[in-house]
Amino acid sequence: IRLAAPTGRAAKRLSESTGMPASTIHRLLGINGREDLDEIDIEELSGRLLVIDEMSMVDTQLFDLLLRGIPGGMQVILVGDKDQLPSVGPGRVFYDLLASGLLNYRELETIHRQGKGSTIIALASAIRAGQLPEDFTVRQPDRSFFPAQTTQVPRLIEQIATSWKEKGNSVADMQILAPMYKTPAGVHNLNAVAQEIFNPMTPKKREINIKLG
């Protein structure tokens, strides 16, 4: 049995969940991703079963290389979420394979990442269908909505993170997601806001401050 995923992180998670060794697809095929696609000589994979996780992240070029290495008689299981963001590279391989109707597939409907009665599940399903529930802005036990201008976001994050810390939580218990790197509401600035709260600079610690430019 061979296990692989598009990224190192996904491969590590796959290995942890199965208790079996897993690798990136590139490593499985013995390539580094910098070769000339037309000149790559892919050797046939050994084994009887190949499982590829996070298939939605696989682009057309990588899938082509993978197919070159699959020998006749090897069974292949592709695992993924067609509704996740598509691959960075060209193509929507996993989505198109399912839409083609040429493959047998099973769709898992039970969500284990959210507790029973979670409103996030219903909200995500509605947004995926292009709808916005009327109670989107109404505070729920497991989610809240705070309207804010771009310049107001850092202060809002500061208040939320400070409150979170005061309740005894650490930075490892919190995730901040942003759709971009720059702007006041971007990743770079919000990381600085979070660092000032959870790991501020202090004369009591030996630290090095590095600035780019």
Each predicted region: which residue ranges?
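ASCE P-loop NTPase helicase motor core
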Residues: I1-T137
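Conserved helicase motor core of P-loop NTPases
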Residues: K82-L212
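Short, flexible surface segments
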Residues: G72, L212-G213
